[in-house]
Amino acid sequence: MGSTNKLKFISLILMLIINYQFSNSQIYEFGGIFGGTNFIGDVGDTKFINPNESAFGGIVKWNRSPRHAYRISFISSNLTANDLDSNDPRRNERGYNFSSNIKEISTGMEFNFFDYNLHEYDVTFTPYIYSGIIYSKYENLFFNGNNLENSNEYDWSFGIPIVLGLKYRIFEKFILSFEIGARYTFSDKIDGSIPYNENFNFTFGNENNNDWYMFSGLNLTYTFGRQPCYCNIK
């Protein structure tokens, strides 16, 4: 099964799960994601919060209780990095750079630090954390000597999101969230440091450290659904 078919299959499974939850639950949110991304790996700067590319996407949540919600999201962005932006003189001298389009599907659980019942309008904000699993699809890149090559194919990797956020009710039905999240991927190939093709054996960087990328931005969601009864939730 090709990477495109894998992405379609996983998207279908996740949407079936969401549809099932919608038919059996009470409080939902859906909306848009807007922000920026930056890469942390074997090329470029290593600052954790340094967005240099715009990102956008969508998000759906099922609020299972005032303290936790299940969610699924999609983000599209580019990951770019340039050794000349690094504080490491060895990277400055090397001078590598890359740019790769990336698409991410994420699903997992969001935990609120405070009780956050969407039908109690005096409850206006809460910090939260989110984690789960991500599926990232990115371009296959490799370096042929000092030249970056694009295979015009895509690869994919699973990963783990580690997200800290703050949500705030701005209107009766609208929630604005700000979050900063790291994505630890199970791949070290996003920046082209490990070629996907065995015919190109030029590698560089630390092969024991996988690639990371960050998302910093806003979620704006609309809430709907009848008032829930949380009395049976344990």
Predicted regions and their residues:
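Short loop/turn motifs that connect adjacent beta-strands in outer-membrane beta-barrel proteins
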Residues: 23-27, 66-67, 115-125, 170-173, ...
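Short glycine/proline- and aromatic-enriched beta-strand/turn motifs that initiate or cap beta-hairpins
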Residues: 23-63, 140, 217-228
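Residues that define the transmembrane beta-barrel architecture of outer-membrane proteins
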Residues: 26, 50-54, 101-105, 125, ...
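Residues on the lipid-exposed face of transmembrane beta-strands in outer-membrane beta-barrel proteins
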Residues: 32, 36, 58-62, 107-111, ...
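Extracellular loop and loop/strand-boundary signature of outer-membrane beta-barrel proteins
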Residues: 40-47, 90-98, 147-152, 203-206
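Outer-membrane beta-barrel translocator domains and adjoining extracellular loop/strand segments
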Residues: 42-47, 83-89, 120-123, 140-147, ...
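Gram-negative (and chloroplast) outer-membrane scaffold detector with strong preference
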Residues: 68, 72-143, 222-224
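Predominantly the C-terminal beta-signal and adjacent terminal strand-loop region
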Residues: 81-84, 170-234
